[in-house]
UniProtKB/Swiss-Prot annotation:
<dbReference type="GO" id="GO:0005179">
    <property type="term" value="F:hormone activity"/>
</dbReference>
<dbReference type="Pfam" id="PF00212">
    <property type="entry name" value="ANP"/>
</dbReference>
<dbReference type="GO" id="GO:0006182">
    <property type="term" value="P:cGMP biosynthetic process"/>
</dbReference>
<keyword id="KW-0964">Secreted</keyword>
<feature type="propeptide">
    <location>
        <begin position="23"/>
        <end position="109"/>
    </location>
</feature>
<keyword id="KW-0838">Vasoactive</keyword>
<dbReference type="InterPro" id="IPR000663">
    <property type="entry name" value="Natr_peptide"/>
</dbReference>
<keyword id="KW-0372">Hormone</keyword>
<keyword id="KW-0732">Signal</keyword>
<feature type="disulfide bond">
    <location>
        <begin position="115"/>
        <end position="131"/>
    </location>
</feature>
<keyword id="KW-1015">Disulfide bond</keyword>
<dbReference type="InterPro" id="IPR030480">
    <property type="entry name" value="Natr_peptide_CS"/>
</dbReference>
<dbReference type="GO" id="GO:0005576">
    <property type="term" value="C:extracellular region"/>
</dbReference>
<comment type="function">
    <text>Exhibits natriuretic and vasodepressor activity. Has a cGMP-stimulating activity.</text>
</comment>
<comment type="similarity">
    <text>Belongs to the natriuretic peptide family.</text>
</comment>
<feature type="signal peptide">
    <location>
        <begin position="1"/>
        <end position="22"/>
    </location>
</feature>
<dbReference type="GO" id="GO:0097746">
    <property type="term" value="P:blood vessel diameter maintenance"/>
</dbReference>
């Protein structure tokens, strides 16, 4: 009963002694350039700009259906986009909507209650020191 435990412990101690080589992954210059161009282009967009972009795009059939695959052969579990929005535009629109919602949530919470904030005012009211 003690032998399997000793064998496992010995294997665990010996395993790191083997020489292993790792390769460092570097980002592709093309990927970095793409991200920089993407951020330069879409950095100052507002939600209205995104809606204008979406409405100005021509309706294109989905690439899955242009390859000759009939709709009846397409699996039922596959999501077919209801709108002609591209994935990037929907992502950006959702992000901008979340930013606007975060600003209103922050103002609704009322971070600046009292003299020193909610926690310190609570401590001050319990101790009777107040502001």
């Amino acid at each position: 009963m003690l032998y399997p435990a000793l064998l496992c412990a010995a294997l665990l101690l010996i395993a790191p002694l083997g020489h292993t080589e790792g390769r460092t992954l570097y980002p592709s210059p093309d990927a970095i350039q793409f991200v920089e161009q993407f951020l330069d282009r879409y950095n100052d967009l507002t939600l209205d700009d995104l809606e204008n972009l979406v409405s100005s795009q021509p309706e294109e059939p989905s690439s899955a259906f242009t390859s000759g695959v009939k709709i009846a052969e397409y699996p039922k579990w596959a999501d077919i986009p209801a709108q002609g929005d591209s994935t990037w535009l929907r992502l950006l629109k959702g992000t901008l909507a979340n930013q606007k919602r975060a600003v209103t949530d922050r103002s609704r919470r009322g971070w600046n209650r009292g003299c020193f904030g909610l926690k310190l005012d609570r401590i001050g009211s319990m101790s009777g020191l107040g502001c």
